[in-house]
A protein has these predicted regions:
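N-terminal helix-turn-helix DNA-binding module of bacterial transcription factors
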Residues: 1-64, 208, 343
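Alpha-helical recognition/docking segments in bacterial nutrient-uptake
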Residues: 1-5, 63, 67-182, 186
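Short acidic/polar active-site loop segments enriched in Thr and Asp
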Residues: 20, 123, 189-191, 252
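Hinge/beta->alpha junction and helix N-cap segments in small-molecule ligand-binding domains
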Residues: 73-82, 100-109, 131-136, 160, ...
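Short helix-capping segments at alpha-helix termini
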Residues: 93-94, 151, 215-222, 246-250, ...
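Short acidic capping loops at alpha-helix termini that bridge into adjacent secondary structure
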Residues: 190-191, 222-226, 276-281
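Flexible loop/turn connectors
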Residues: 242-243, 247-344
């Protein structure tokens, strides 16, 4: 049975869990130096005592607007920087401070950051970036979100996170993947290399699904094309490009599934003296600010990233609905100078 939470302190959690106050603090904040088994035991005690609920009650009682937590995979990635800009804009109009957490694309760091934000007394959390198709990660994320919402917190996500059951802004990744592949196929390309991130990311699975649909209309499958999974970064794009070119030197196009990877692809092609688009066409996905200023300017799929950030926080500021709300962020094909009709 839960204790009455008035006046509940960290020392109460520590005593009940049989640990020091310092250890309890580290466990609840997600800090290093505590084993996962011990941290989970302390969190279970805190949940049973209602300690998190007490933290939020004190925050609300202070009269201040609870802050906003924003979880991103990589703050240096222009995709997430644009999203953060939208979140900050809306937060500013509501007088709320934003705390940004960077996960370094590590799923377990993402779970720890969620926990840290809850214990930092934010009232809203926006999770930006792809959901993960990993049941263990999904289960841990869901547990943190449910605990937060059970004490009045609000959560919204950007991307497909079907296991969380929260309000979401979902980019049209399937449609975008289809559009960019159809563009290359329409230019006569059939020997297309694909530079992809991990298929354990829902974003990647969706973009590849769209590409697959376009290929199917031309009698091809993903298995017919060289596909390299690498980090969803510029360096990952370089790695993918090198492998594609080394193993399949006859490719006439490389389809990168985000703009960061596309920049890496362009870099490797430049190093090897491969003309773009004369020898190899290159495409990206997202349309980050720099995409239109590259040489050659990058053909890509535009997503309204800043608006996605705005919409996510706007959803989270609304009272919780009986069923999760979902908004779709539409895509637009941006044809620029990095693609051309296949030679011969």
């Amino acid at each position: 049975m839960r204790k009455h939470t008035a006046g509940l302190r960290l020392v109460d959690v520590a005593e009940q869990a049989g640990v020091s106050i310092a250890t309890a603090s580290r466990a609840l904040s997600g800090a290093a130096g505590v084993s996962e088994a011990l941290a989970e035991r302390v969190r279970a005690v805190a949940r049973d005592l209602g300690y998190v609920a007490n933290v939020h009650a004190r925050s609300l009682a202070s009269g201040a607007s609870p802050g906003v937590g924003l979880v991103v995979h990589e703050i240096g990635d222009p995709y997430f920087a644009e999203i953060a800009s939208g979140v900050l804009e809306v937060a500013g109009t509501h007088g709320r401070m934003v705390q940004i957490c960077h996960t370094g694309r590590d799923p377990f760091t993402e779970v720890a950051q969620l926990r840290a934000l809850v214990n930092a007394r934010v009232g809203i959390i926006v999770v930006a970036g792809s959901g993960r198709l990993d049941r263990d990660v999904q289960s841990r994320m869901k547990a943190e979100v449910q605990a937060f919402e059970s004490v009045g917190g609000r959560v919204a996500v950007i991307g497909r996170h079907p296991h969380l059951g929260v309000d979401a802004v979902v980019p049209a990744n399937v449609e975008g993947g289809r559009a960019i592949a159809e563009h290359l196929l329409g230019l006569g390309h059939r020997r297309i290399g694909i530079a992809a991130g991990s298929r354990r990311l829902a974003t990647m699975a969706d973009r590849l699904d769209g590409v697959s649909r376009a290929l199917g209309e031309h009698g091809l499958t993903l298995d017919d094309l060289p596909l390299v999974e690498a980090e969803f970064t510029l360096d990952g794009g370089k790695e993918a490009a090198r492998r594609i070119l080394d193993e399949h030197p006859d490719v006439t196009a490389i389809l990168a599934l985000n703009d960061d990877m596309a920049v890496g692809v362009l870099s490797v092609l430049g190093e090897r003296g491969v003309a773009v688009p004369g020898d190899v066409s290159v495409t990206g996905f997202d349309d980050v600010t720099v995409a239109g200023h590259l040489s050659p300017a990058l053909t890509t799929v535009r997503l309204p990233m800043k608006d996605m950030g705005r919409q996510a926080l706007e959803l989270a500021l609304l009272p919780r609905a009986a069923r999760p709300r979902r908004r779709t962020a539409e895509q637009e094909l941006m044809v620029r100078a990095s693609t051309a009709r296949v030679r011969g």
